[in-house]
Design a protein with these regions (language model features):
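Walker A/P-loop
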Residues: 32
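Catalytic cores of NTP-dependent nucleotidyl/adenyl transfer enzymes across multiple folds
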Residues: 341-422
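Active-site nucleotide-donor binding segment shared across nucleotidyl transfer reactions
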Residues: 25, 129-133, 245-290
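Small-molecule kinase domains that catalyze NTP-dependent phosphoryl transfer to phosphate-bearing small molecules
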Residues: 111-112, 139-140, 160-211
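Metal-dependent nucleotidyltransferase catalytic core
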Residues: 156, 160-172, 207, 214, ...
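ATP-dependent NMP and nucleoside kinases share a basic, alpha-helical "lid"
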Residues: 113-118, 124-160
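Helical scaffold of the NTase/Pol beta-like nucleotidyltransferase catalytic core
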Residues: 18-21, 110, 199, 204-260
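ATP-dependent small-molecule kinase phosphotransfer cores
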Residues: 53-124
Length: 422
């Protein structure tokens, strides 16, 4: 819960432009090394561990609250907090631990908010949170950076550099998130196994090639775009989509009826453009408009000129040619490292339903998947060599359109035959 308080502080105080990066990693992985480089490059560092110590220094209201709750025997002779003495009292039972959290964590959250409020509107805020993964805090940040070192190397560092007993080192590592959990949360994975300084160039490249353009895109309302060319299916697309969905869910709150990974990247084994497609289902377009600013702040600005899908002919099964019910809102990711299209459609309208149907049809039918792959390959060839992005997309979509007009009817026939439901 304390991590949520810290993160809510970040979101309540920020101006709507700054980029928020969550930095974490297992004990002994060296995330402080990465934080140092990011700070040298201009990042605004918010270190949760440092703040947790700061808010209970001598003379602070935090320390006074601790002594009022746990007694003056938690103080050292010089008046500072005796942390082992506090731990002996606060971690002996669940009720005491809750009392400790209720004192310290809101103070850390408030101090975090102060730091963020003092940052420039175009800042890159780096929030160092040791238990970010364990606290499921990824959606609160535009990006999560994981610093990784394998467990044995971390044990060696903890025992050799910090003098920690091996049993304690292994116990602390075992109590933290697994590597699989960290990989699922990581937008950026930094392997810090090498010698000191070996990751510095990687961190600088991250800053220059992704963080700075990402922040600028958010501030200027620019969507990251890629040319419509097919790439080999990437198993990582599914985890990437899950992280995007989590961020969108946080931004939309109860305005979203459901949020789904759609399109070719949602079909395992299907080659596709390296762009994640997500559909947010809403009750009405007024709801879509009401969350436009939250989505921009979350890193998904709106594209004003893409507010409809092309109606499909009414062949008697699922078809509806009325343009009004093919309206939508379109947002896109500002992250140059993970382009994404975000389609906001109304629950039950034909474009909303077909997006789900088409995905499931492709997943279920190998022959259709192969057929569609060929169509996309030819569409990419039609767009190849066209340097203007809008023109390339138009050529790509026009090449697919005739097939889709027929596929719409075929998909709905499959839906009736299989009793498909969204």
């Amino acid at each position: 819960m304390h991590l949520r308080l810290v993160c809510f502080g970040v979101f309540e105080c920020q101006t709507g432009c700054m980029l928020r990066l969550g930095l974490t990693g297992g004990i002994g992985a060296g995330k402080s090394t990465v934080a140092k480089v990011l700070t040298e490059l201009g990042g605004v560092l918010v270190d949760s561990d440092v703040l947790a110590r700061e808010v209970v220094e001598p003379g602070t209201p935090g320390l006074q609250q601790l002594t009022d709750t746990f007694g003056t025997d938690i103080l050292a002779p010089d008046g500072s907090l005796d942390r082992p003495a506090l731990a002996a009292k606060a971690f002996g039972d669940e009720e005491s631990r809750k009392k400790l959290n209720a004192i310290v964590h809101p103070l850390v959250g408030a101090r975090t908010a102060e730091i963020i409020d003092g940052a420039a509107s175009d800042a890159v805020v780096v929030q160092d949170i040791p238990l970010l993964v364990e606290g499921s805090m990824g959606p609160f940040f535009h990006l999560v950076v994981i610093v990784w070192v394998d467990a044995e190397e971390r044990v060696r560092r903890l025992t050799g550099q910090r003098g920690m007993p091996e049993a304690d080192a292994r116990a602390r590592i075992a109590a933290q998130a697994t590597d699989d959990a960290r990989r699922a949360a990581a937008d950026v994975w930094i392997d810090n196994t090498g010698a000191p300084g070996s990751v510095d160039d990687d961190v600088r490249a991250l800053w220059n090639d992704r963080l700075i353009p990402f922040e600028r895109n958010i501030r200027e309302g620019v969507i990251a775009r890629v040319h419509p060319e097919q790439v080999t299916a990437d198993p990582a697309w599914e985890l990437q989509a899950r992280r995007i969905v989590s961020r969108l869910a946080l931004a939309c709150s109860d305005k979203a009826v459901r949020i789904d990974h759609i399109g070719s990247t949602a079909v395992p084994g299907l080659d596709a453009k390296d762009v994640i497609d997500i559909q947010i289902t809403v009750r009405g377009l007024d709801d879509a408009d009401s969350v436009a600013e939250q989505l921009r702040v979350a890193g998904f600005p709106r594209r004003e000129d893409a507010d409809f899908d092309h109606p499909k002919p009414a062949y008697g099964i699922g078809g509806e040619a009325d343009p009004a019910v093919w309206s939508k809102r379109f947002h896109g990711s500002a992250d140059p490292g993970r382009p994404a299209n975000v389609h906001i459609r109304v629950d039950g309208w034909p474009n909303q339903t077909f997006a789900l149907l088409f995905r499931d049809w492709l997943r279920a039918d190998d022959s259709i998947r192969t057929e569609y792959s060929g169509i996309k390959r030819r569409a990419s060839e039609a767009a190849a060599g066209i340097t203007d992005f809008a023109s390339a997309i138009e050529a790509y979509e026009n090449a697919k359109a005739p097939w889709f007009d027929v596929a719409y009817r075929r998909a709905w026939q499959w839906a009736e035959e299989t009793n498909w439901t969204a």
